[in-house]
Amino acid sequence: MANFTFIPTLTFVFQNLLIDKVCLVNLNYDPVICSNLTNFKDNEKEVEKVVASINMYLNILTSIPAIIVSLFLGPWSDVNGRKPLLIFPQIGTMLTQSIYVINAYQTSLPGEFILLASIGSLFGGWTAFLIGVYSYISDVSTGQARTYRIALIDLFTYVGYPLGTFLSGPLYKYGGYYTVFGLVSVMTGLNFDKIL
């Protein structure tokens, strides 16, 4: 659980990737401008417009499938078990990270290519994972133990997000995109190992 709450905050770095893509590829600005974008206010505004538009579409493309899938997951997991609800979001995360890595590696791809990362939401995303975790905890624990375990889930959630946010900047600064997205992939792999 700690890994899965930590992982999404590390990928905030993808915003930097999107800004780089839009600046260098979509708008075809000089690399000097893109590396010092805050010093070029007019260029920065143009980049922000395109990035905001792509982010809006990405949010729509990731939210709608996850909402629809999540509506059916609770009853489905009553029949088919809880583990798929823990595994499917991990698969989606791996697909999303793959799209981010491809974007980082293929510097000539436009910013809109990052919209393909929304394919991960077809696996339920964060909502499906939480449904799976809370349902699994309810199935395997009783009384006092259930309360304690649910409190631990909340603790990991509230610690994981700020920790991931705090570490994403230094990891990106010293290791670049591959370090951040690679770490997310490794952590997702560790989740697979624990779930199976």
Task: Show which residues each predicted segment covers.
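Membrane-interface helix-entry/capping residues at the boundaries of transmembrane alpha-helices
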Residues: 55, 86-89, 146, 150
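Hydrophobic alpha-helical segments of secondary membrane carriers
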Residues: 58, 116-122, 134-137, 150-156
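Conserved MFS/SLC helix-loop-helix module at the cytosolic interface between two early adjacent transmembrane helices
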Residues: 65-110
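Hydrophobic core of transmembrane alpha-helices in multi-pass small-molecule transporters
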Residues: 95-128, 136
